[in-house]
Amino acid sequence: MLSSVCVSSFRGRQGASKQQPAPPPQPPESPPPPPLPPQQQQPAQPGPAASPAGPPAPRGPGDRRAEPCPGLPAAAMGRHGGGGGDSGKIVINVGGVRHETYRSTLRTLPGTRLAGLTEPEAAARFDYDPGADEFFFDRHPGVFAYVLNYYRTGKLHCPADVCGPLFEEELGFWGIDETDVEACCWMTYRQHRDAEEALDSFEAPDPAGAANAANAAGAHDGGLDDEAGAGGGGLDGAGGELKRLCFQDAGGGAGGPPGGAGGAGGTWWRRWQPRVWALFEDPYSSRAARYVAFASLFFILISITTFCLETHEGFIHISNKTVTQASPIPGAPPENITNVEVETEPFLTYVEGVCVVWFTFEFLMRITFCPDKVEFLKSSLNIIDCVAILPFYLEVGLSGLSSKAAKDVLGFLRVVRFVRILRIFKLTRHFVGLRVLGHTLRASTNEFLLLIIFLALGVLIFATMIYYAERIGADPDDILGSNHTYFKNIPIGFWWAVVTMTTLGYGDMYPKTWSGMLVGALCALAGVLTIAMPVPVIVNNFGMYYSLAMAKQKLPKKKNKHIPRPPQPGSPNYCKPDPPPPPPPHPHHGSGGISPPPPITPPSMGVTVAGAYPAGPHTHPGLLRGGAGGLGIMGLPPLPAPGEPCPLAQEEVIEINRADPRPNGDPAAAALAHEDCPAIDQPAMSPEDKSPITPGSRGRYSRDRACFLLTDYAPSPDGSIRKATGAPPLPPQDWRKPGPPSFLPDLNANAAAWISP
């Protein structure tokens, strides 16, 4: 989600009046203009006193600031800004907790955020408080203690009382790789990922969000009221992706334009497809979906009950049917053949027919309104539905045929009736425990394979041992030595070993010799130990999935999601664009002491066009000013006269992506944008190559700094936006100074260079 951060433009008189009460700002530091020839020099005018910080530092490559922070004591700059030796101490205030360490300690991990505090321009790039002589970071103080200890000892441990995502976010902010976590804490660190993966398997579309999307897509329906149940979080894994696809489509249609899928001109399909799909697929999406789920559950139970009763003797009728056939012998009388047929009660067949009709209707509705037919047919539950329905229709269609082929097919279909029992798996859509069992079996595949391997090895070993142990003490007259024992060969011993190792002990086979009894005792003990090893892992998986499923069901629905407030004026993140750097002397501005015109600043990425153009009496009436014949540029409003308030001096808006889980410290984003911290995972850069960061308001001074949210962009000749790499723009001058209009042609050329046609 995008939220706006207001950044004052400081252009015009009205913009300055919008600022909150603050100490008197110091005049902006800009390099002195190039010396003019003696005949062109103007009389010196009184100006503000020089800053105690000394003359401004020269510009670095890329027109980035590299001057020291104004108002910062020289001693502090020497201590924190790069002066002094590695033995100097540094104070870091993290979330109100002060930490003190040596600068040499922070340099042990170059390229990280803390290592940037030891660089010369650290006081200007980070939030430095000259009064308290400390750097401030509004982050988690408890996690920072572990991070700082990593710099001291070289070992990164994970606190047990901190949630994994929080620790991961803090590591990303400080620029530390998570792979540096010690092996002893790695399992503790990644526990949150296991929990997130387990929750994703139970993840479902938000019932409220789905209903809102459906309501926005069309008219309200009384039978589709939004009433999320207590168990609105569970879905079967086979159809979860289909549900997400459907609700994504619903959300896209609901948020579309008025004439699109979500507006009044939307099609009937886009309006009703998500609703009908949720009606038959997600029992927690609405009250009507609950009724459909209850009906489906009722017919499933009736179908299974009917299937079981068909095998009971009380519902089976044996009938003898006599069929007269022509004798194969010519001239012989017809023969009467009596066939014995087994039939079930007719009412059971009628009940099964009603159930099949419901299952057919449900299957057709689900496959018709499914957002992805391919994914639908890949689902195991949907395959079971289709296979359980087809035999009934084939049996009804072939029942009237008397050919031998038809009877063979009918016999096969009666055998295939057992597929109907698989409908019991459809209950997983309605019961959390069954879904938990399914997820547990899938998550414990490795443990099951390990258990099978252990059992296979034990069965092979003990079956061989019992075969030869029973041969000890055999009758000398018994050539095979198997007359006195049940174990006549090793394959028979496999069955005995499985029964013994699983502690079942049917008693159909048992050893009769003392050596065989000893082998049997060892087999039972080995079976207990073998099964006991992987079973706790499977039980733990079941407990984890069950607890997460219950927690997800009992988790209250969040109606109002917390969104962090945008930085306010006076906060470290409330910053202003840097004034443009000085240009080289212009060849056409060397006479009469006339100040060269400032450039027409192009709107930066994410900044409103208003406020991008300065105002003043210098403005060319046909280029920027509206009025008598004035056209203005790009549809901008006319600029005011000197005595009029400036409507363009308004706050610029910069958009920050708040959806980033680590909005304040994604190391990849910081490394790509060269923002807010030294480049992470990149070679060390000179101080001139790095963009300074706005110091916080905790220092008692006010000064314009380069905002880490802004980068310099210029339009290319073809109208596209690109980073400015050409000559630096003209310096800011006093627009109130009168001067002849000799520079107007150059101003037009400058405007044409900045503004795409």
Curated annotation (Swiss-Prot):
Residues given in the record as Zn(2+) binding sites: H157, C163, C184, C185
Q: Give the subcellular location.
A: Cell membrane; Presynaptic cell membrane; Perikaryon; Cell projection, Axon
PTM characteristics: N-glycosylated.
| Record disease entry | Spinocerebellar ataxia 13: Spinocerebellar ataxia is a clinically and genetically heterogeneous group of cerebellar disorders. Patients show progressive incoordination of gait and often poor coordination of hands, speech and eye movements, due to degeneration of the cerebellum with variable involvement of the brainstem and spinal cord. SCA13 is an autosomal dominant cerebellar ataxia (ADCA) characterized by slow progression and variable age at onset, ranging from childhood to late adulthood. Intellectual disability can be present in some patients.
What job does this protein perform?
Voltage-gated potassium channel that plays an important role in the rapid repolarization of fast-firing brain neurons. The channel opens in response to the voltage difference across the membrane, forming a potassium-selective channel through which potassium ions pass in accordance with their electrochemical gradient. The channel displays rapid activation and inactivation kinetics. It plays a role in the regulation of the frequency, shape and duration of action potentials in Purkinje cells.
Protein family membership: Belongs to the potassium channel family. C (Shaw) (TC 1.A.1.2) subfamily. Kv3.3/KCNC3 sub-subfamily.
Descriptive protein name: Voltage-gated potassium channel KCNC3
